[in-house]
């Protein structure tokens, strides 16, 4: 039986006054997914929604939830980031998947498609913009018949 998988998509810039709300909503969404049998959680390694999601998953796992955290990185050089939040996320991951060797515009779309293709549920932290990676990923997920849960900011 295929393990139930959930991924996140969302904006890198989350307004300061929305951070606590987004973190709380991500926690609720992840806990509901765990109760529904989800055990594998994938994040794309970007600032903002991805790292908040990863921190929530890592915290639940530390509390004893039998879940795994995966980073789907768009290109290998991303591993060289010195951002402390990124490095904390990487060290918490059970698996790291690198989608492309070199950085390019297309590697981000490759990463987003991988996450959706692997997932049954996509949690989207979305500000209503009609362009960009978040809306692309949401539309791709809907085209693939995946469940999309939106956290509006």
Describe each model-derived feature in a short phrase.
Residues 1-153:
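Acidic/glycine-enriched connector segments
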